[in-house]
From Swiss-Prot:
Residue numbers carrying N6-(pyridoxal phosphate)lysine: K229
UniProt-annotated binding residues for (6S)-5,6,7,8-tetrahydrofolate: L121, G125, H126, L127
Pathway: One-carbon metabolism; tetrahydrofolate interconversion; Amino-acid biosynthesis; glycine biosynthesis; glycine from L-serine: step 1/1
Cofactor: pyridoxal 5'-phosphate
EC number: 2.1.2.1
Name this protein carries in UniProt: Serine hydroxymethyltransferase 2
Record carries keyword Transferase: yes
GO molecular function, one term: glycine hydroxymethyltransferase activity
Main location: cytoplasm
Disulfide bond annotation, renumbered to this chain: none
GO cellular component term, pick one: cytosol
UniProt superkingdom: Bacteria
């Protein structure tokens, strides 16, 4: 039998030591990677439970294994709460990731070689929206759409390509697009031309849940998402859909692309969805957007360019060319100052993908730890201070000291 009193630090000191160092890093650094956030202690506790021991192939009430009466309760709670948050007719909480959620929809409604419209990765889309290096781009005939001359989603291009290529499915959503997406307009283009409409809100889900970003569920046939990022849950995926396609989607996930679901993760999803239904989460989502606006506006005042001219969400792309520094260099020097970002290509980027001319910034994590407009403005100025003098080690050290003061005042996990 196992001894409950035998803890990780005793069983595996090497793993424990690495985890402790990561805990310190998360507490000390300002996290600005748009796809990252902090899960609550309750979410992490749920994910660390004995539910990891249970196989539960199938769905609540229709399992291929015995002993599922309690995991059935947990999964049904997750389904019901997710539907309540977004107003969905049906939902599947079993996808292990956002990528698998997208793959599940594709498997449910497409055949290899079918034509699909998706946002170009180079202009803000995601790998799973038809990038040539991804399975989606290898299995299906994806036609990319992008931005217009003002770096706004080119709806006229979407309509033109739809009429020309007659896709079976149109995919909306992005990993690096700062503005609102007109889901109603996209749905009209799709449905008027006989196409199905899917929206990937992996980045925006928490904002949608909090009423700070448009909800695509009333307009789309399928809505996929991750459960981490702005939703602050465990790493995983979900699919929401119209009731008439629920059976096809469920079959695509299991037995189509997955076997037994991760019940400990589904428990953590259920907890996160309960948190997302709270008034406090509504306030959080609104603050994420407020912080992003201040961050973007301050960076512009300091001589940087924001792609699309502004942000209407949690995320922004920063064009670094005015500062004469690449995204790769900026990521490294900001990291030395304890500000964590990721290099990111900008539209029509002349640099290679591993170098880039931009960085992507997001405010979900900083907002979770209690940053408001004043801290967002300070953070933007600290970023600009580093980028103005990226090779001045004394300057970087001074910024790092100010970052450490700020993060010590507003810890991620307080008492």
């Amino acid at each position: 039998m196992f001894n409950r009193n035998l803890t990780l630090d005793q069983v595996d000191p090497d793993v424990w030591a690495a985890i402790q160092k990561e805990d310190v890093r998360q507490e000390q650094h300002i996290e600005l990677i748009a796809s990252e956030n902090y899960a609550s202690p309750a979410v992490m506790q749920a994910q660390g439970t004995q539910l990891t021991n249970k196989y539960a192939e199938g769905y609540p009430g229709k399992r291929y294994y015995g002993g599922c009466e309690y995991v059935d309760v947990v999964e049904q709670l997750a389904i019901d709460r997710l539907k309540q948050i977004f107003g969905a007719e049906a939902a599947n909480v079993q996808p292990n990731s956002g990528s698998q959620a997208n793959q599940g929809v594709y498997m449910a409604v497409l055949k290899p070689g079918d034509t699909v419209l998706g946002m170009s990765l180079a202009e803000g889309g995601h790998l799973t929206h038809g990038a040539s290096v991804n399975a989606s781009g290898k299995l299906y005939n994806f036609v990319p759409y992008g931005l217009d001359a003002d770096e706004v989603l080119d709806y006229a291009q979407v309509e033109r390509l739809t009429k020309e290529h007659k896709p079976k499915l149109i995919v909306a959503g992005a990993s690096a697009y700062a503005l609102h997406i007109d889901f109603e307009r996209m749905a009209r283009i799709a449905h008027d031309n006989g196409a199905l409409f899917m929206v990937d809100i992996a980045h925006y889900a928490g904002l949608v849940a909090g009423g700070a970003y448009p909800n695509p569920v009333p307009h789309a046939d399928f809505v996929t998402s991750t459960t981490h990022k702005s939703l602050r849950g465990p790493r995983g995926g979900v699919i929401m859909m119209k009731a008439e396609v629920e059976k096809a989607v469920n079959s695509a996930i299991f037995p189509g692309i997955q076997g037994g679901p991760l019940m400990h993760v589904i428990a953590a999803k259920a907890v996160a969805f309960k948190e997302a239904l709270s008034p406090e989460f509504q306030d959080y989502a609104q603050q994420v957007v407020k912080n992003a606006k201040v961050l973007a506006d301050t960076l512009v005042k300091r001589g940087l360019r924001i792609v699309s001219g502004r942000t209407e969400s949690h995320v922004m792309l920063v064009d670094l060319r005015p500062k004469g520094i690449t995204g790769k260099e900026a990521e490294a020097v900001l990291g030395q100052a304890h500000i964590t970002v990721n290099k990111n290509a900008i539209p029509n980027d002349p640099e290679k993908p591993f170098v880039t001319s931009g960085i992507r910034l997001g405010t979900p994590a900083m907002t979770t730890r209690g940053f408001k407009e004043a801290e967002a403005e300070l953070t933007a100025n600290l970023i600009a201070d580093v980028l103005d003098n990226p090779r001045d080690e004394a300057n970087i050290a001074a910024v790092r000291a100010r970052v450490n003061e700020l993060t010590a005042r507003l810890p991620v996990y307080g008492n």
